[in-house]
Curated annotation (Swiss-Prot):
The gene is pepA. This is Probable cytosol aminopeptidase. It comes from Alcanivorax borkumensis (strain ATCC 700651 / DSM 11573 / NCIMB 13689 / SK2). Binds 2 manganese ions per subunit. One of its GO terms (cellular component) is cytoplasm. Presumably involved in the processing and regular turnover of intracellular proteins. Catalyzes the removal of unsubstituted N-terminal amino acids from various peptides.
Length: 489
């Protein structure tokens, strides 16, 4: 999708369609020619459009405009929230994409509480996401959309808007990279495949270097927890390290992203139920969001030093697989009693977290994982859980989520929960019982991040949409992560 901005008089601006947001209590935009405003007014009085929230109506042959049609979008009778505005952008884009329109123009909304820069940046991102399609495996893909370009229009020239749409598009591209990886079937997307994706990114972007540790190398280094998960599969586990140097390394160290990359999760010996097990291909959503964030950072050429680590493995039942009751030694030297092999994400993450701290000395570490079903019970599909040992980091991530509509919610990491992980035989066990499952999983990870500013995002409820024809990866939390990185570049 191509984007542009314009402040040419609307009468001289050629487009197949002009998108206009209208509320029940708002006057018609003065930027529209008087004849067009009168035409819309008559259209409304006739009952064809009442500006109710989410209503979309085509008005053909608008007067005194060099556009074939108007798409009228109702905003209702009260001010739109940011989330409501983004939802309307998504809905309008879907309508445009299913029409004959090739080039559309979007009349920016002076009545919205957010800035024009925000509207263009987040609008471009949502448009990029809304035109996404994944039909790689269909023998007869659906016809491609005609929509190729969207121009944001405002009467006053604003030099920030060009940068805004470029930023929005780059984030949207990153989101769609994450969605592509999540939507791939597990027979094609496995740990070695993800290594190939990383290497391809390294070839595409000069400032990105890639290193891959094999399962054997990881085991030799002492990653006993990671190896315990990976050894049950014919597919070899991989520790994938991508280092982006958009700024010179400093004594402070880089920011690190660490993603859980379980490309398929059967639960291992603690086998999951068969129903919806197909959706366990999405258990690499954390890794997918790391790849997507790296893509965006490279596209924007951000002036930061970033290290991104993906712990990629399959969790499969096998004669070599870890058993409930096994005790393993982690890279940190701490020992873990494995009581449930389906609590494998924290096992691969704990060694990846230790690795990135030992090798790269980051000042901030953020891990991202589809970690617990308990998080879905607590927060549903709207917010990812945000845990952190640093209040400023937590607040920065929550602010980034609010800014982009990719929202999170703060969760406790109180010492009182740590006792649920006590083991009679090892330093800790990998589950904390039936209560507060998302919290105890985060407490487990906190034991491997005591010396660094750290946050954990549990995205089990937000990484994909479950069931039905709308099923698919969402690409979250790429918008939150990339906004945080931009704010701290």
């Amino acid at each position: 999708m191509d984007f542009a901005v314009s402040n040419r008089p609307l009468e001289k601006s050629k487009a197949d369609a002009l998108v206009v947001l209208l509320g029940k209590k708002n006057d018609l935009p003065q930027a529209l020619p008087s004849a067009t405003r009168e035409q819309i007014s008559q259209f409304t009085k006739a009952g064809d459009f009442n500006a109710s929230k989410g209503q979309l109506v085509w008005l053909h042959a608008p007067q005194d405009l060099n556009a074939d049609r108007l798409l009228l979008v109702g905003t209702g009778d009260s001010p739109l929230s940011d989330q409501g505005w983004l939802s309307l952008v998504h809905k309008a884009t879907k309508t445009l994409a299913s029409s004959p329109v090739k080039q559309a123009m979007w009349l920016l909304d002076d009545t919205h509480t957010q800035t024009l820069e925000w509207q263009v940046r987040e609008g471009s991102r949502v448009v990029e996401e809304s035109t996404y399609r994944f039909d790689n495996y269909r023998s007869k893909p659906a016809p491609a959309s005609n929509l190729a370009k969207l121009t944001f229009w405002h009467a006053e020239k604003d030099t920030t808007l060009t940068k805004a749409h470029k930023t929005g598009k780059a984030v949207g591209l990153g989101v769609n990279v994450a969605r592509d990886l999540g939507n791939l079937p597990p027979n094609d997307c496995y740990p070695e495949y993800l290594s190939g994706v990383a290497r391809d990114l390294g070839k595409e972007y000069e400032k990105l270097t890639v290193k891959v540790l094999s399962q054997a190398q990881a085991e030799k280094m002492g990653m006993g927890a990671f190896h315990a998960v990976a050894k049950g599969s014919e597919r070899q586990g991989q520790i994938i390290v991508m280092e982006y140097k958009g700024a010179k390394p400093t004594k402070q160290g880089p920011v690190a992203l660490v993603g859980k990359g379980i490309t398929f999760d059967t639960g291992g010996i603690s086998l999951k139920p068969g129903a919806t097990m197909d959706e366990m291909k999405y258990d690499m959503g954390g890794a997918a969001s790391v790849f997507g964030s790296v893509k965006t950072v490279c596209e924007l050429d951000l002036p930061i030093h970033l290290v991104a680590v993906v712990a990629a493995a399959e969790n499969m039942p096998d004669g070599r697989a870890a058993r409930p009751g096994d005790i393993v030694k982690t890279l940190s030297g701490q020992t873990v009693e494995i009581l449930n092999t389906d609590a494998e994400g924290r096992l691969v993450l704990c060694d990846a977290l230790t690795y990135v701290q030992q090798k790269h000395k980051p000042h901030t570490v953020i891990d991202i994982a589809t970690l617990t079903g308990a998080c879905v019970v607590a927060l549903g599909a709207h917010a990812q859980a945000v845990y952190s040992n640093d209040d400023d980091l937590s607040e920065a991530l929550l602010a980034a989520g609010k800014e982009t509509g990719d929202r999170g919610w703060p969760m406790p990491l109180w010492d009182e929960y740590q006792g649920q992980l006590d083991s009679p035989f090892a330093d800790m066990q990998n589950i904390g019982g039936p209560k507060a499952g998302s919290i105890t999983a985060a407490c487990f990870l906190s034991r491997f991040t005591k010396e660094v500013k750290w946050a954990h995002l549990d995205i089990a409820g937000t990484a994909w949409i479950s069931g039905g024809m709308s099923k698919g990866a969402t690409g979250r939390p790429v918008p939150m992560l990339t906004r945080y990185l931009m704010d701290n570049a």
